[in-house]
Amino acid sequence: MGGLMVSFYQAFRFINVYLQYPIVVTLQMDQKQFLDFPAVTVCNLNRIKEKYLRCIHSNVSLDLCYVQGFLPVDNTKPNLIMSERTGLHSCTSEFRGNSDAEKDFTIQFLKTYLALNSKNRKKVGYGSKEFITLCSFNGKLCSAKDFTEFQNLRYGNCFTFNQLYQNESKPLTISQTGDQSGLVLVLDLLDLYYLNISSTIGARIIIHDPKEEPSPEETGINIAPGYETSVALTQTAVTRLPAPYRDHCGEYKNENIWPYHKSLNRCVRNCIQYNSFEVCGCADPTLPSMTSQKLCNLTDKSEMCCLDDILLLLLEENRTCDCPLPCSSISYGEKVSVARWPSASSFFTGEAEYTYYPFQFRKSRKSQAKLKIFYSSLTQKNYVQRPMFHESEIYSHLGGELGIWLGMSLMVTFEIFEIVCMLVKILINFLLRCSSNE
């Protein structure tokens, strides 16, 4: 009897662990002959050209603005970093009278910019042909036509190389390593068009999975003019298990349907907007939202504080968004190095050019940036989640416990169970016959 109780106790402990669905993570290093090249998104840190600022504040047609040559606004205001709403408002300071003219100016600009439709936002931003002045991939020339455009509220017009959509099957691949392979870009930042509230001159670079949309606010690096920035990449793949295992991973589909959870970041943003609209009656104007949702007023104290309260509530453990990790994801390790560019010896080809072209050299260093993105290794690092136990191991474990403590195999146990069932059946039939005879 003691052995039977111990075997049942051990079996109970095993089943309890099994129902927690533990996992093991395996690491594999796969040396590839060809490796998929990532998507590369580039954005200017200045989302709108300064020459259009007077026009959008005065509600002047952008076409007339360009023809009539409206002067830009006064440049005497101090520089500010372009930020989202949370970087401009705080219920504990600004709305108690501690706001300053700098933030007020930035808030007014954001209100005006967010009121523009997508067509006008595209007009006042940078075009791909003027922004991307040189492009090559694996030594072959490419152009601005090889980039897809999308709009971002913080960075304006952004451009993506090697972006995949549902009707496309495979991204570009690469078979060589080193800075002589991969993608090479020369970007013209057009610093003369920068707003006085854009305190940093440069470009935002996002390296991401070709099947995923970029998130410039959450990921990416900034590059500066006058430098060649080299980014050496390594690739890591992660495969997770769905429910009931601990990560409860999900699949994000690349669909333009609300809520269009193309990615984990988009899912979180949609969750924030949904809760904001439900509680505050309006959505955060600096995040993507449904066209039917009313946008909050950036200068309204109650609405801004309500949006802050929503973020605090969502940070609590019991109010998390239902946004699981993706079941499969690709990430890239980035090792960044920089060097001055261009050098005087490469820019000038003769003594005469030193006399006639010093201005162009200074302008190039002030406004242009060079970017190299390549793989440092074709080894893919794979992390794969696997179940620690399979269903068949339940029977194996039960049989093992019975064998250790009772000296019985699982087959013998089933035979005993079958005999007991037959005896019970015979006893029931006997009792039924006895009752009928009486």
What are the residue ranges of the model-derived segments?
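Long, solvent-exposed, non-transmembrane segments immediately flanking or lying between transmembrane helices
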Residues: M1-E317, C321, E334-W341, S345-S346
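Long, compositionally biased charged/polar accessory segments in the mid-to-C-terminal portions
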Residues: S263, I272-E438
